[in-house]
Amino acid sequence: MANGFYRNHTSKNDYKHTGVLGEIGVGYYKPLDDDPFILEAYIGGGMGTVSKSEVLTNGSESRTATFDARAAKLFIQPQIGYASRFFDMALSPRFSLVKYTNFSSSNYTQAELANDYLDNGKLTDKPFAFAEPTVTVRVGYKWLKLQAQYGLTINIGGGNIRHPDNFSSLGVVVDIAQWYHE
């Protein structure tokens, strides 16, 4: 299993947010006795970066404030689903730990950092734990399928951190083993 994420968001008011994450994992796949139902489990990790730049104004004065951080991630992803030649659907209660390192910021006040939970080393102090329940749907033929995924992101430990409440993705799945054995 290999996943990648890239986001580059710029808004009209001089706000820019970027993020990159790469993940790799290994997994186990087993058809259940009631074929076409399957059980899958993955474990893996990843690394990434996040940065933000924004122009803040106070009356007639303005300043550009920035922050950057690196992150490491570990995850476990059990999954139960239905698989056929043309359609797959799965439910997964994915769990992940994210540890931020190398945090740096400039031109933010202590109050602004505290508002984003970035003050006093809170971001890099300990790992954050997340539950990420997910629904995955795949449509295609045999070893090549289009995948759509939707999930929630729930902070279950490690303290307060700003994060999105949900996520979605669209991608292509290539089952190399099935392709090879055809």
Question: Language-model features: where?
Answer:
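Glycine- and aromatic-enriched membrane insertion/assembly motifs of diderm outer-membrane
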Residues: 1-52
